[in-house]
Amino acid sequence: MSEKGETLIEDTAEIEFEQTVDKTQQWGRLKNAAAFSLFRDLHMNESLQRKHARSDYKVYDLNNRVIFHVINTTAMPITKDGPFCLKVMNKDKKSVAKFLRNEPKRSYKQTGLASLFGCCSDTEDTMEVLDDNGLIIATSFLHHDQFRGILITMKDPAGKVLIGIQASRDQKDVFAVSGPDNRYLGEIRQKIISSGNSTDNYKGVACWFSTEVSLNVKVFFMAAAFLIEIDYFSETKSRQAPFRTPEADYLNPIIKTPPHNERVPKMKTNISKTRKKKGKVSDASKDSRPSETKKETLMMPEIHHTKHFDSIGGEEQAFAKKEKVEEFKPTEAVKEEVDVNGMSRDQFRNAAKKVVDYLMKQDESIRAARCSPALKPGYLKALLPPKAPQKAEDIDDILEDYHKLIVPGLSHSSHPNFHSFYPAGNSFHCLLADLLGGHIGDAGFYWTSNPALTELEVLMMDWLGEMMALPKEFLLFPEASRGGGCMQRSDTESNFLVLVAARTDMIRRMKQRDKRLRSSDILARLVAYTSSDARRSIKMKMAAEVAMVKMRVLPTDQNFILRGDTLHAAIMADIERGLIPFFVGANFGTSGPCSFDHLHELGPVCREHGTWLHVDAAYAGTALICPEIRGLMRGIDWADSFCTTPSKLIIAVCDVCCLWVRDRHKLQHASLENHPDLPFKGLPTSQRVGALKIWFMIRSFGVENLQNQIREHIRLGQVMTKILQKDLRFEVCNKVVMGLICFRAKSNDMFNKALLYRCNETGNVSLASCVLQNKFVIRMCINSPKCSEEDLDSAYKLICNEYDILKPFQYRIEVMNQAELETFIRDPAKIHSSAEVSRRFPVVNPLEPCRSLAQISSQMHTAEYADPPGKSNKSPQVAAKGELPSAAPPSSRTPNSDISEKSDR
């Protein structure tokens, strides 16, 4: 080494090990040494290695002390051709920098003689270095030419060269580092490190730099070393090669193996104990004897993963004791019949076939079934035994009881005329995915518990985000993105999670302005806002009560849309009262009237006052897959978070709500767990396999088929809207954009409640209700994939029939209270007799002058408490002229019966 190089401080890669080694004799007198320890599980398919599939790095000093932790925050294993994001943290758990490669950027060019041999002549790769605030401070460009060697250039955002690293084609172990003025700064080398045993050695990457080097340059050294290790020293074939002698394998670039005390025991075959016959030796004994002709050498075992940390800087878990593992031969078939959880494999196969056959028959006959059950609450208690069985029962008996006891009490959401709620489509592909997910039986606590499903969730969120054309700030993998998506169990949980995240962020910002403020004082002044959509406002109020903040419900316009001037006036009024606005919940096709708030008006108001804008698109969010619907998302760039439930619009059986945030770090701060393995999730630690079902759904149908299904859903909604608008007896109460129609009969709330009950009582249709601007309306959601125009026509005819049956009783029903209405509808036929109905609810004579409701109520009250006919000298009250004495009660009439009491429309 030159004189200039002798003055450098050598930094070597050291790993923790029990046996102390005299490093001074090996490497000379070193001070302030730092090194990189790269751990990687190369045998994740081996059963012994499955629980150690995480790839983390550490930076050590000469005294074997950890000075930096480098965490793989992408929840993906590091590969040469894959994206990664490495987060550098010091020993105090504070972020120092990030190394980000969003996706491999390689160009393979075959020119000249290289094309004849089929080799790559030019390879390029790029990695960004970010500070703890997410700002790019440098970008490294690796250029590998097969004939000229490796060159790494690190530049700042302005394009100025910070450091340059170069190695010739034949120089595989040393990379010279120079500054912007070509001044020699140090070297990056691949070094051999002894583990304390003369036969056990491993390799690592070491950085040498002078004492004058600043912290930023050290970070650049670190970034370049990781890029070299991943792109150059980490060839798979070289990694798996045996490491026998350090001298012969010095230039063979392989990943550093762990020290001796962390190595995986070599798999050995247990010697079967057999009695030896005279003159014969068992085959097992022959195989177990070492070969006398071959010299026994210590082979490099399978590379083991680093010791797992529950948290950075925490105590390391002790490794399990080394045990001899019997070699498994996959070619041998298991012949014995093994009971798995009380059922053999053949029994499960037969039972699964019966269940599938039953589901297919049920799906074929779904139109003949009732949409909703005709049962009273508590019916199942009388049918099931009071105590659990002591002994196991046959699966056939269980399936039979399911058909007889459970199915009659089910609401068939896949029925073509089930329009009450949002039916989850029973796609066969998603049912298969649900079966696979149930067999996995893994809740997915964090990456190490279930790597595949954790990574699949992150990827599916980006798939859906790109399909819906969400802003790139909401996606995880674009360059320098701080956003991302995660899956929650419901939209209510998503709303609560972002509410807590906004609360935490506002408290942090207020404390930065004035450190004297206490969290409790700030919390008492926080106020959130949402619109007066009844169902959603109730959910948001509950979330606000749990989060211990105030929730203010704002009025909407005639189209149930929250406007920007309304929000601005409310915020200014609360600021004058000393409150702190921090959260605004906007509607984007939610569950009530399917209204779309003007985000382009709400966004600037929220940005002006520093409030969190959350967009709840529980129902209509997935419709953004269709390009023609995206005009409704004007102003989505102002949003801080966005959530939707795919199962409410598409045919996926997805029991998840997809939540995207602009800054995932704020969501992590609000989470109960802040483990590096965890994606930025919310309250639940465990997670179902919703990502697996979404993956099956997207691949099975494709984006085009999903778009066609949404368009058909919207078309049927418009068809039903036109039918209702042509009928003068009904009025449509919302602006129908999707397939959700809110309508009511042109009468008061009591009559519409009776009409809704009568329609649902038939079992041929299922409708729901909601309250819009203090009016009771009937809510019809067309969402079943089996629904057609013929089904809508039959549902409309049924509604008209029930309306005609109730029309003669309209004036009586309108003056009833809730208790009287329930009695009128639900009580036996005795209450519904013509004389009893006429006595309790007298009809209005249309020939008499119009009376007020008070007069009608007074007359009804007098008739209610009059003496019975047998005890009074007066005859019973005779109905006024126009009374229909032969009118039968609604419960005793059928749609096909002759209606003799129809009134003129």
From Swiss-Prot:
Q: Which residues carry this modification: N6-(pyridoxal phosphate)lysine?
A: 648
Record: residues binding pyridoxal 5'-phosphate = 492, 591
Q: What's the source species for this entry?
A: Caenorhabditis elegans
What protein name applies here? Answer: Probable aromatic-L-amino-acid decarboxylase
EC number(s): the record gives 4.1.1.28
Its GO biological process annotations read: amino acid metabolic process; carboxylic acid metabolic process; dopamine biosynthetic process
Q: Where are the transmembrane segments?
A: none
Q: Which Pfam families match?
A: Pyridoxal_deC
Q: Which gene encodes it?
A: hdl-1
